[in-house]
Amino acid sequence: MEHLLLFLSCLSMLVSIAFQSVLLPLILHLFSFFLLSFLSFLHFRSFSANNFKHHSLFLVPKRRSFSISVLPAAAPSSPSSNSFLFPSLSHYFYSLRDTTMVKLTESAVYIRTKCSLENVKKLNLWGCGIDDIQVCEKMSLLEVLSLSVNEVKSLAPLQHCKNLKEVYLRKNCLESLDELEYLKELPNLRTLWIDENPCVGEGGQEYRRKVIRVLPNLTKLDDKPVTTTDHQEAIEDSIPECDMHNSHYSARSNRSNSIDLMSRSLYVGPTVVDRIVQPQLLHFGDTSDEERTTYPARSFSVEVPGLPLTEDHTTVYLDSAPQSHIGSRHNLMSQSMYGTLCGTLAEEPSSADGEDDWNDFSIEEDRVMVQMPLAASHRMYQSMHEGMVIEMKRPPVYGRSVSMPRRRATNLTTRASSMSPAREQRLTKIMSAVSVLLDELDTDGLRQVVDEAQRRLKKQR
């Protein structure tokens, strides 16, 4: 067709030159145009006849005019190859990943799950570039959540998902393990995968111990089961050795330094009976021959006026090494009785040659003497002795600390060991008679009796 048009143009030029006329070339040009139009019509007709079976005519609207387009009548392409007709999930986010924040929306969740936020139980958002999951706080029934290969930085919205069982957060942007604190209140959480996050670092056992310490209910961490050994290491790592040592030392020092007020002093009216400066352990109970041999200077017997001595509950032991007798029990009554007994003994000045007998013991020598009626003293001794007998039958526990001079303990031991059963019975009868007579005395008379008893005690020593 193109060659024919060129041929007619050249022919009209030659005719105009040969005949030196203007009208003839115009006629030739008109003839050429009509001939070309006719040939074009024939060509289009033959083309339509051959291809009408394979093509269809579609009207495509363009504003107010219409144009005819010829489109293939074959089946439409698949969604994977035609992103315009079938948009992907990323078109439902607010913006592109490379430019601004990508926020998870309700419409995106609905496209994936075909249900409302309140009814979602499983949600897979792998590789969507999401960095805002605030909408997850509305998913109260959510059990399985996959957010791997995203840009999540905070787990705060997940603290409202109380039914969460599995959370997958691999390859995200978690900067600190403190974000796991938001998952502590999830009772059903058993599987967690946070590997390849900045907070993991190089990983290893230390990282696993930290995670297990925060979430002890986990059974699977980073696609690895959590064993009993992991739990033990997490517990041991949570209690530093220095803290354990300080706690043990503090408890031991409190036990050794605490002295009960009743063991330090006994008040009869305004008068202070006894004051103990440095405590030592006081033990009441049975003793064996081996113990008496090991501590001969620390063992003595206490003679209680008005009460018979028994072999089971009248022996007193002093020991300056608490570690060898941990577990012995000392009740308040026995300690108060000991303080009262020491207070009723007459004081003697310490001599230069007797200073070695006291060693590390320290008791005030200018202590006020006890002014107490003997009847009241007898009743007090009796009640204290009964309480001491009951206490001796109980299991041993930690006791209090008191002290007493070794020299006096030795003297008491000598006198108590030399007392015969007949003398004990006679002394009991005498004390009973004295108690009856003391009931007839007034306060002044009782004081005179106490003074006389103290003077005689000094003479006996």
UniProtKB/Swiss-Prot annotation:
Its Gene Ontology biological processes? cytoskeleton organization
- What keywords were assigned to this record? Leucine-rich repeat, Repeat
Is Repeat among the key words of this record? Answer: yes
Q: Which domain of life is it from?
A: Eukaryota
Which first-to-last residue range defines the signal peptide?
A: none
| Keyword presence, Glycoprotein | no
What protein is this chain from? Uncharacterized protein F09G8.5
